[in-house]
Amino acid sequence: MTLSEESHLPKHVAIIMDGNNRFAKKNQMQKGDGHREGKNSLDPIVEHCCTRGVQALTVFAFSSENWNRPAFEVDLLMKLLEEAIHEQLPRMRKFNIALRFIGDRSKLSEHLTDLMTHAENETAHFTSMTLTIAISYGGMWDITDAAKQIAKDVSDGIVDIEQIDTHLFGRYVSLNQLPPVDLLIRTGGDYRLSNFLLWQAAYAELYFTETLWPEFSIDEFDHALAVFAGRERRFGKTSEQIQQDKIEN
């Protein structure tokens, strides 16, 4: 089989876009310039995912923990996020991509949340791919929020407590209308998930690279896809069972 075959291509790719500040320091730039370079690095990856046939791309733009950064950097990141949304809309129309956002919107400015809602509404009918940007997001927040929603539905008589299982719980977390994450890529050299998509990436293949996000290229993205294609995904089964399933199917 070739990499281009659907069985070898991840349906859902997630990326922790790490390394902007280190890129700026490495190149004797201001922090803001590093983040701006990182913003620009997303565009070719989005287009490439769409042309390759990836169904969903989810990127970590601003975490729950990022609120702890210096105020000037948070303000800069919020401004860049607004710029990115404005810049992405024409690309979404051109490539027929739906744009979505996940995260705790209660901490965001009204202007930014209105812009996010507008972008979602403008692209809701596009079907080639779904690009999701995680802003003010944390996996633990996501799971806790889902638990609160379930508790309310139990209290309101909508859900019986005996109905609660992983399938039902999964309907309450973010990205519940998308396939589970197949491949999670982290740039920047750290080897951790940093509280990103803890539920959705439970069975994801992980690809870590020392490459800083502003330097992450389409060639390395394709290498990550090739690594993914070479892995055997067992989901608790043995290799023998997987081989037998392939024969039978």
Curated annotation (Swiss-Prot):
Homodimer. One of its GO terms (biological process) is polyprenol biosynthetic process. It comes from the Bacteria. The active site is at 18, 66 (proton acceptor). Catalyzes the sequential condensation of isopentenyl diphosphate (IPP) with (2E,6E)-farnesyl diphosphate (E,E-FPP) to yield (2Z,6Z,10Z,14Z,18Z,22Z,26Z,30Z,34E,38E)-undecaprenyl diphosphate (di-trans,octa-cis-UPP). UPP is the precursor of glycosyl carrier lipid in the biosynthesis of bacterial cell wall polysaccharide components such as peptidoglycan and lipopolysaccharide. It is an enzyme of class 2 (transferase). The keyword Cell wall biogenesis/degradation applies. Substrate binds at residues 19-23, 31, 35, 63-65, 67, 69, 186, 192-194. Its cofactor is Mg(2+). Signal peptide: none annotated. Its EC number is 2.5.1.31. InterPro entries: UPP_synth-like, UPP_synth-like_CS, UPP_synth-like_sf. Mg(2+) binds at residues 18, 205. This is Ditrans,polycis-undecaprenyl-diphosphate synthase ((2E,6E)-farnesyl-diphosphate specific). Keywords: Cell shape, Cell wall biogenesis/degradation, Magnesium, Metal-binding, Peptidoglycan synthesis, Transferase. The keyword Transferase applies. Belongs to the UPP synthase family. Binds 2 magnesium ions per subunit. It catalyses: 8 isopentenyl diphosphate + (2E,6E)-farnesyl diphosphate = di-trans,octa-cis-undecaprenyl diphosphate + 8 diphosphate. GO terms for molecular function: ditrans,polycis-undecaprenyl-diphosphate synthase [(2E,6E)-farnesyl-diphosphate specific] activity; magnesium ion binding. GO terms for cellular component: cytosol.
